[in-house]
A protein has these predicted regions:
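N-terminal presequence-like segments and the immediate start of the first folded domain
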Residues: 2-91, 97-155
Length: 155
């Protein structure tokens, strides 16, 4: 009976995460945070890249919201690059905002510098708070790197 169970377990295909590539931060302090909290910066599953939410903090003194968003979008761009993708491969953006009224215009201005047509799907949600508490916006993206053909827009 036990030998039959062992054969069944050995024949079981690996789980989905065992067939993925995990992208972790290069900076030791950030990597430790990800390991302590138990999450990847990004994960490549087949031809899809799932980037964990990147939290944009309140702008430093003398900086603008656009400056803060630019740092966040650049960080996402770096994660995409290390995952073998770029902003052109992004098919979905989900953003969480603590104040949609003041954050949307600067976010859109910066997004237009990084994200070009054909545009990905985008959902923006207002939330009461983010982790860490100094966070004002969190941006999560999904990229698709399969079938890298010339993109076209529908009429």
């Amino acid at each position: 009976m036990l030998s039959a169970l062992a054969v069944l377990l050995a024949a079981t295909p690996p789980g989905a995460r065992e067939q993925t590539t995990v992208i972790m931060p290069e900076e030791p302090q950030q990597r430790q945070i990800h390991e302590d909290w138990g999450f990847a910066q990004a994960i490549i599953a087949g031809e899809t890249i799932h980037v964990s939410g990147v939290v944009i903090g309140a702008p430093a003194e003398g900086a603008s919201l656009q400056d803060a968003y630019d740092r966040g979008f650049a960080r996402i761009g770096d994660i995409l690059k290390r995952s073998g993708a770029s902003w052109h491969d992004v098919v979905e953006i989900i953003s969480y905002h603590t104040d949609v009224t003041t954050q949307m215009a600067p976010m859109i201005a910066v997004k237009h510098r990084y994200v070009k047509a054909p545009y990905p799907a985008w959902t923006a949600v207002e939330v009461s708070r983010l982790i860490p508490d100094r966070g004002i916006t969190e941006i999560k993206v999904t990229a698709y790197i399969g079938g890298r053909k010339q993109s076209t827009t529908a009429p």
